[in-house]
Curated annotation (Swiss-Prot):
It comes from Mycoplasmopsis agalactiae (strain NCTC 10123 / CIP 59.7 / PG2). Catalyzes the attachment of alanine to tRNA(Ala) in a two-step reaction: alanine is first activated by ATP to form Ala-AMP and then transferred to the acceptor end of tRNA(Ala). Also edits incorrectly charged Ser-tRNA(Ala) and Gly-tRNA(Ala) via its editing domain. The lineage of its organism: Bacteria, Bacillati, Mycoplasmatota, Mycoplasmoidales, Metamycoplasmataceae. Consists of three domains; the N-terminal catalytic domain, the editing domain and the C-terminal C-Ala domain. The editing domain removes incorrectly charged amino acids, while the C-Ala domain, along with tRNA(Ala), serves as a bridge to cooperatively bring together the editing and aminoacylation centers thus stimulating deacylation of misacylated tRNAs. One of its GO terms (biological process) is alanyl-tRNA aminoacylation. GO terms for cellular component: cytosol. Its EC number is 6.1.1.7. Its cofactor is Zn(2+). It catalyses: tRNA(Ala) + L-alanine + ATP = L-alanyl-tRNA(Ala) + AMP + diphosphate. This is Alanine--tRNA ligase.
Length: 880
């Protein structure tokens, strides 16, 4: 069995099933689209449910994917067992009414034995005891009966109580006695172990359960499979646990740079208890940071609500585990690059780093605050600390129970862990009834509110007088608080985060106290819950004041989002949908589906169209109507109708005959108040989804254009300087400084820079050809190829020299490999007409964590430098 990287395993899976006429589906976002039943995409089939249910026509009836997924229901086992993860990749092959058991079983055997070259004798197979058809197909594929284990309904039958269901067959790999001396009893009795690793599960969707336990055969039978990439990687790389595979180990080695401790792979067998605890902490951080990075990259935001609450919990748990590893500084945000390098997904690295760093800073302050709170609860006469209070510190303030126990231990005080676990169980039971969101958790756990109680006046007013209906923390209703908590007002002008618009900011006045608004969100009844900072009581009236500057910024960018959406549909086509948006007072983002990035010309057309709407000074209307009438008037249903409490009275925002949208947000009264509009970036968010970033208002747009102008002028000066270094008498053409506006001037400078880059490239080519002595080129005969390797070339000339050698020396089998070393990084170009340069480069890049590629005659990119690079190059040359 050949050692394979995770990248190679993933690609082999997709290539194999593509060769079996499966359509390759790219991994979708971790955040479900139009599926309120899921908090996260949690399996390979989760994004394909509508194809199996018949709600949508599939693009093909044979599909395959490698889908990223998140599950956090078993978090306590992460890092403790060899294979539990919160983030993982599920390899899948699916048949929608096409092939069934015979083909699915044959494909599985062929892939594992012929493609991955696994030892057939080390594979074991379970099947449902009544499914003799599946058993016989395994026998037909050469499986010895001693390697077939029958299972019960509990182990080998998928049934959710009603709907499609059926038996399944599982494939296990035997890693040998060194992992567990017990034999097949482990499989037969379904005992958790590290010897027999489940690597593949094939579900035969064969029956329909009517909910009463009556089963009928489905006319359309389906195949749903899942194979864990992490498990396959650990087997193919012959390492003790998933965490020792290439998907995790580089992350762990990066964490080691900030810790005085080391992760020891060999401890799996050595069983040193202290080292085991150290290893577990490394594993937990490596697992959690993968989840956090990919979730944020897909658009999740750290918060106390829903997905954001889970991200916050994982980040804080990781931060504390870092403390246990002796890490004193902020370090989690420094792991983003190594996580990104280990996986094939593209996203804006800086956004993820910024989000994680902000949460790290916040939690570091929380820990200091938690220590003070802990001291305030102490009773030095009592040597046992109330576990319920310890749980409250964890849930309300995010203060880890381990840290509470550690601080108290130093004072000779223990924590009543029975009381802690009881409080935890009560909290879990109270939270199960509602949606998995932070706000529901708060409301459900207290049972404070059972109906709509407040009145929102923020559409027309920026201030309001009100009485306080309720004050509470996350556990109890309170009569008052000293530093902050949650507030329900009878009347509020503060808009709650929803529909892509961020919440208002401002303050509440109560007597002599000024209370700061930190967050505003809605509970399930539509009440506005205010999270505030300051001193407050529940018996004095209050006055609330929205910050008008923040509100106008929010309204600009929310109205700008509507106008942008309209312009996109006009320029790119009416098929464009709004997949997500986020508007704050400074900028807006808009996510939309597209097979490829819009061209610069298309983006300019969109921008110009939005500006034309501004110039037209169109009044805004708020219209309350029914869903049916909203559709008749052409309103775009960008929000789920379920957000509106009464479908007979929904709200439409209309700007003349330009755009009508279902929307609950606040907006400008006229398009002219947007003042200006500028798209600052268009980036690929994930497969098939792009994100536009934009700003509005004359002030912000002018500030942005001025910064761009400064940067362009610096770039212009740099390129002119570089050209003069190559040709001292060069005179750059002048730029017209009398352009009508700064944006036109910037476009002029940008165009001139592009022209000068071409001049520089040509001069550099001439210079490189003069400076490089081609007479010194000597070829080595390797596998019947004429190979020239030189890794000491100036970085600016690597590509040119590689291509020149390829073209100058027409020896039939010339392969030029030119590189430039920079500390531990290597810039490498492969130029040849004898082999596929791109394929060879990809193999090297996979081995050395590289990126790049190109065409069959020239491929180029960066990778880690290795002393063995030349021998690797020789190994990866195909046989002539």
């Amino acid at each position: 069995m050949k050692k394979l990287t995770s990248t190679e395993i993933r690609q082999k899976w997709l290539d194999f099933f593509e060769s079996k006429n499966h359509l390759v589906i790219e991994s979708k976002s971790l955040i479900p689209v139009n599926d309120s039943s899921l908090l996260w995409i949690n399996s390979g089939v989760a994004t394909l449910k509508n194809y199996f249910s018949g709600k949508k026509v599939p693009p093909a009836f044979r599909l395959t994917n490698s889908q990223k997924a998140i599950r956090t229901n078993d978090i306590e086992n992460v890092g403790v067992t060899s294979r539990h993860h919160t983030f993982f990749e599920m390899l899948g092959n699916f048949s929608i009414g096409n092939y069934f058991k015979k083909e699915a079983i044959a494909y599985a055997k062929e892939f594992l034995v012929n493609v991955l070259e696994m030892d057939f004798e080390k594979l074991y197979f379970t099947y449902y005891e009544e499914d003799l058809e599946a058993k016989n197909y395994w026998l037909e594929n050469g499986v010895d009966e001693s390697h077939l284990i029958s299972g019960t309904r509990d182990t080998n039958f998928w049934d959710l109580g009603s709907g499609p269901c059926g038996p399944c067959t599982e494939i296990f790999y035997d890693r040998g006695e060194k992992y567990d001396r017990r034999g097949l009893d482990l499989l037969k009795n379904d005992i958790e172990n590290d010897r027999y690793i489940e690597i593949w599960n094939i579900v035969f969707s064969q029956f329909n359960n009517d909910g009463e336990g009556n089963y009928t055969e489905l006319k359309q039978k389906n195949i749903d499979t899942g194979a864990g990439l992490e498990r396959l990687a650990s087997i193919m790389q012959d390492v003790p646990t998933n965490y020792d595979s290439d998907l995790f180990i580089n992350i762990i080695r990066e964490i080691e740079k900030y810790s005085p401790y080391k992760y020891v792979i060999e401890n799996y067998f050595a069983k040193d208890e202290h080292q085991g605890e150290i290893n577990t902490n490394f594993k937990i951080i490596a697992d959690h940071i993968r989840t956090v990075v990919n979730a944020i990259a897909d658009g999740a935001k750290v918060s106390n609500v829903g997905r954001g609450y889970i991200i916050r919990r994982l980040l804080r748990r990781s931060y504390y585990k870092g403390m246990q590893l002796g890490i004193k500084d902020l370090f989690l945000h420094k792991l983003v690059k190594v996580v990104k390098d280990s996986l094939p997904y593209e996203y804006n690295e800086k956004d993820v780093i910024d989000a994680i760093k902000e949460e790290e800073l916040l939690f570091s302050k929380t820990i200091e605050k938690g220590k003070i709170l802990l001291e305030s609860f102490l009773d030095n006469e009592n040597k046992v600390f109330d576990g319920a209070v310890a749980f409250n510190l964890l849930e309300t303030y995010g203060f880890p129970i381990e840290l509470t126990a550690e601080i108290l231990h130093q004072k000779g005080i223990s924590v009543d862990m029975d009381a802690f676990e009881l409080a935890k169980e009560k909290h879990a039971l109270a939270s199960k009834g509602g949606k998995a969101t932070g706000m529901d958790k708060v409301i459900n756990s207290l049972a404070l509110i059972d109906k709509k109680m407040d009145n929102f006046v923020g559409y027309s007013e920026l201030s309001a007088n009100s009485k306080v209906l309720k004050l509470f923390d996350e556990e109890n209703e309170v009569e008052g608080f000293e530093t902050g908590g949650y507030v329900l007002l009878e009347t509020t002008p503060f808009y709650a985060t929803s529909g892509g618009q961020r919440h208002d900011k401002g303050f509440i006045i109560q007597g002599e106290n000024k209370i700061k608004i930190i967050d505003v969100f809605k509970d399930k009844f539509g009440n506005h819950i205010h999270f505030v900072e300051g001193k407050m009581n529940n018996h004095e009236p209050v006055s609330s004041f929205v910050d008008p500057n923040i509100r106008i910024g929010l309204e600009r960018n929310h109205s700008g989002t509507h106008l942008l959406f309209c312009a996109l549909r006009n320029v790119l086509g009416s098929h464009i949908e709004q997949l997500g948006s986020d508007n704050n007072e400074e900028r807006l983002t808009f996510d939309f589906p597209a097979d490829e990035k819009p061209s610069d010309e298309q983006i300019k057309a969109v921008e110009d169209l939005v500006r034309s709407y501004i110039t037209k000074s169109i009044d805004r209307e708020y219209i309350t109507t029914t869903v049916d009438k909203a559709r008749e008037m052409g309103a775009i249903m960008t929000l789920e109708e379920g957000e509106y409490m009464d479908p007979r009275a929904i709200r439409v925002v209309r700007f003349g005959d330009i755009t009508s949208d279902l929307c609950g947000g606040t907006h400008l009264s006229n398009t002219s108040k947007l003042e200006s509009f500028k798209i600052t970036n268009v980036e690929k968010k994930q497969a098939g989804v792009f994100r536009i970033r934009a700003i509005s208002s004359s002030k912000l747009v002018n500030e942005y254009l001025s910064k761009v102008n400064k940067k362009l002028n610096e770039e212009l000066a740099t390129i002119i300087k570089k050209i003069k270094e190559l040709k001292s008498d060069y005179v750059a053409p002048a730029i017209n400084e009398n352009e009508p506006d700064i944006e036109t001037l910037n476009a002029s400078i940008n165009k001139r820079i592009d022209e000068l880059r071409e001049v520089y490239k040509q001069l550099l080519k001439e210079s490189s050809n003069l400076e490089f002595d081609y007479e010194t080129v000597k070829f080595d005969k390797i596998k019947d190829y004429d190979v020239y390797i030189n890794l000491d070339v100036d970085a600016s000339a690597v590509k040119l020299i590689a291509a020149s050698i390829r073209d100058k020396f027409q020896l039939g089998k010339t392969v030029a490999i030119i590189g430039s070393k920079n500390e531990n990084e290597l810039l490498l170009a492969i130029a040849t007409r004898a082999i596929d340069a791109n394929k060879m480069f990809k193999k090297l890049a996979s081995e050395l964590n590289g990126r790049g590629g190109g065409a069959p005659i020239l491929a180029m990119g960066k990778m880690n430098y290795s002393e063995d690079i030349e021998s690797l190059i020789k190994d990866y040359l195909p046989d002539a």
